[in-house]
């Protein structure tokens, strides 16, 4: 995602979910789009050829959707974006920080046991 978030108004997810069939895949993809909307504080529009299409607000709420294997169109005003989120500021640094701290703790525990 573009680091200059102030220039973004919404996220778009165009996808081909046909190869998933009626499995859980399209539902997982739709849920992932909801997470991206919440992470970035931006509304998301998802259009899938046979999967689930919909409009999601920045809080992850589904405004409107078209179910699996249903043709249709959605007309809805653009939900407003919200203030920059913590995740949109730091991204995956938090995740990598937790990994590094965990590895350091494991290293020191192992080193301490070695000298006991």
Residue ranges and their predicted role:
Residues 1-116:
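Solvent-exposed soluble domains appended to multi-pass membrane proteins
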